């Protein structure tokens, strides 16, 4: 059997989200608007929770951490994706690709654990670091075009000429354990939540509680659903073009929706937001009067 020649790859070329040139600028404007909205929503939520003493509870501490993780992991992907719409050749260095994959996996793992109300930060960091190290210790051959808009595992594995069996087993084992354990915690939590809601005597209270829980379950379903669709299916069934579209949901859409779904439907957060806006308006009026 002929031995495959392993060459030193110093950079990769990222494939655009869509090949149509006429959609480049509309997509750039759309994703830039989403990213700005995501940054304002998540960072604003953190600021409101940190400055309002009424929100100094474990639940809002959890929400502020979730908002921080949402902002971080979309910031790992979106700025580079926006740049790809503007440049003719979307080049990313080998080290930058490794850093992007490692950072993204770290924040994505933290997101899964936070959604299950778990905070194993050191565990998520070590798993993501080992995961990325396994990927970039593989031997990459002549081709360096990644069929994705960011550095992701499955497209990178298509480029390697090494045996990926051990790596794929690691991906399925880690993803399976993490997803299933997180989903089990979420499921058990909702069994108790629904049981408590059904014991409520007020019909209005039940409707309000189901509305809040339904919003959270929508976010959980979209997030876990896209991850399961992408990472827990056999490689023979993988379509990278379909994966690219699915990954937009959890890299761009979910971080934008999280502050709306998890917080702005909450009465206490709404009141804190109104109070912050009122203070800001009063401060601006005072500054104008001083002038």
What residues fall within each predicted segment?
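Transmembrane helical core of 7TM receptor-like proteins
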Residues: 1-291
């Amino acid at each position: 059997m002929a031995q495959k020649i392993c060459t030193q790859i110093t950079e990769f070329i990222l494939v655009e989200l869509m090949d149509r040139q006429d959609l480049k600028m509309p997509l750039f404007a759309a994703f830039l608007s989403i990213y700005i909205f995501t940054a304002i929503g998540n960072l604003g939520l953190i600021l409101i929770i940190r400055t309002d003493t009424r929100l100094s509870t474990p639940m809002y501490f959890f929400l502020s951490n979730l908002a921080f993780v949402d902002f971080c992991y979309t910031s790992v992907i979106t700025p580079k994706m926006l740049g790809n719409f503007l440049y003719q050749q979307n080049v990313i260095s080998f080290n930058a690709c490794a850093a992007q994959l490692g950072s993204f996996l770290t924040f994505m793992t933290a997101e899964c654990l936070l959604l299950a109300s778990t905070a194993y930060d050191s565990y998520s960091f070590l798993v993501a670091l080992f995961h990325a190290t396994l990927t970039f210790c593989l031997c990459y051959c002549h081709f360096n075009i990644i069929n994705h808009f960011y550095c992701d595992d499955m497209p990178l594995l298509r480029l390697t000429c090494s045996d990926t069996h051990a790596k794929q087993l690691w991906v399925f084992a880690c993803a399976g354990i993490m997803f299933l354990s997180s989903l089990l915690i979420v499921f058990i939590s909702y069994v108790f939540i629904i049981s408590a809601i059904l014991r409520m005597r007020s019909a209005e209270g039940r409707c309000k509680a189901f509305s809040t829980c339904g919003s959270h379950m929508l976010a959980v379903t979209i997030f876990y659903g896209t991850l399961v669709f992408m990472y827990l299916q056999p490689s023979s069934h993988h379509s990278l073009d379909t994966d690219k579209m699915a990954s937009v949901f959890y890299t761009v859409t979910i971080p934008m929706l999280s502050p709306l779904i998890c917080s702005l439907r909450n009465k206490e957060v709404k009141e804190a937001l109104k109070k912050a806006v009122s203070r800001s308006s009063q401060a601006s009026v005072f500054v104008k009067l001083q002038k």
